[in-house]
């Protein structure tokens, strides 16, 4: 068994809570948890505790929720914990150098991609969007840059043709905790090896936007299909028809030459709605019309065949 470390954990969403759960079941001592202050959530905009806070309180772990680390009080509070290490997973706050230097062994971060390929806010989504064949998690020693620190461990897995950001998120939420525990064992035993990132291979994974998720039918069908998977569960790829915004949950690419204007429906039946694109054909298989749940195209056509007649144009 490796040496037990005194760990401060910093994280906020469910992805982070799954890592905290693994730490709470390990030989390491979780001496405190940092998470973002309550934010209004849901339709009622009620102040809701983060999944990390909820889990920490269930295990009687002290919780700290500073707005930032600018005050002397917040810095002194962290220093007083006398931590060996801070583990950061999707915390959502920038950590200044004074915080990074406070724990004896510094701060490490679990990042949801293979660095340095995708640094930044949306690495899971961008790996699918770009057509990458694999992704994973990188555990790195944090520095003042954005995901630029030396890498301590990389764990990879393939991106399947059917993977969405939602399914990939779940896979990485299983892979990450396992990689984290292995990395902590190396750190505790003094055998961890830090590898510098090649900045020349780095890309920035920009945040997604609703505007970006609107389908451009002039793009190639392969790119549109990747966007549909990358933007699920948010912001959801969509198009306009009959002044209604239609969300696309599932589609496939059919390789064939097209002469029609991109966005033109060239076939619509129970096998799908076939739409001309800038290259090849995109076959829509599952859609969501306003006020309804996602349905197979066959059901959509039974209800709204008038919206999807052959020759009509999607925008």
Swiss-Prot record:
Note the CDD domains from the entry. FMT_core_Met-tRNA-FMT_N, Met_tRNA_FMT_C
UniProt binding sites for (6S)-5,6,7,8-tetrahydrofolate: 113-116
Reaction catalyzed: L-methionyl-tRNA(fMet) + (6R)-10-formyltetrahydrofolate = N-formyl-L-methionyl-tRNA(fMet) + (6S)-5,6,7,8-tetrahydrofolate + H(+)
The UniProt record lists the EC number as: 2.1.2.9
Q: Does the keyword Electron transport apply?
A: no
Q: What does this protein do?
A: Attaches a formyl group to the free amino group of methionyl-tRNA(fMet). The formyl group appears to play a dual role in the initiator identity of N-formylmethionyl-tRNA by promoting its recognition by IF2 and preventing the misappropriation of this tRNA by the elongation apparatus.
Which named protein is this?
Methionyl-tRNA formyltransferase
Source organism of this protein record: Vibrio cholerae serotype O1 (strain ATCC 39315 / El Tor Inaba N16961)
């Amino acid at each position: 068994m490796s040496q037990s470390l005194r760990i401060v954990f910093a994280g906020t969403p469910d992805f982070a809570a799954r890592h905290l759960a693994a730490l709470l079941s390990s030989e390491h001592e979780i001496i405190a948890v940092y998470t973002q202050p309550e934010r209004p959530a849901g339709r009622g905009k009620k102040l809701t505790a983060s999944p990390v806070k909820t889990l920490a309180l269930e295990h009687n772990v002290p919780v700290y929720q500073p707005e930032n680390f600018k005050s002397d009080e917040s810095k002194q509070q962290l220093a007083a914990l006398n931590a060996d290490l801070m583990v950061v997973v999707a915390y959502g706050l920038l950590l200044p150098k004074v915080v990074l230097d406070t724990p004896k062994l510094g701060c490490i971060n679990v990042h949801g991609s293979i660095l340095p390929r995708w640094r930044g806010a949306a690495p899971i989504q961008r790996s699918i969007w770009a057509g990458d064949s694999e992704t994973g998690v990188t555990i790195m020693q944090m520095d003042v840059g954005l995901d630029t620190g030396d890498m301590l461990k990389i764990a990879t897995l393939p991106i399947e043709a059917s993977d969405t950001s939602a399914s990939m998120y779940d896979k990485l939420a299983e892979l990450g905790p396992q990689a984290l525990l292995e990395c902590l064992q190396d750190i505790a035993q003094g055998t961890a090896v830090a590898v510098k990132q090649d900045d020349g291979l780095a890309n920035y994974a920009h945040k997604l936007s609703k505007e970006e998720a609107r389908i451009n039918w002039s793009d190639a069908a392969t790119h549109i299909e990747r966007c549909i998977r990358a933007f699920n569960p948010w912001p959801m790829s969509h198009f306009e028809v009959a002044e209604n915004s239609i969300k696309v949950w599932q589609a496939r690419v059919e390789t064939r030459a097209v002469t029609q204007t991109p966005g033109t429906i060239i076939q619509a039946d129970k096998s799908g709605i076939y739409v001309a694109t800038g290259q090849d054909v995109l076959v829509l298989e599952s859609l969501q019309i306003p006020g309804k749940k996602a349905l197979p195209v066959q059901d959509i056509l039974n209800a709204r065949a008038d919206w999807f007649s052959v020759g009509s144009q999607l925008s």
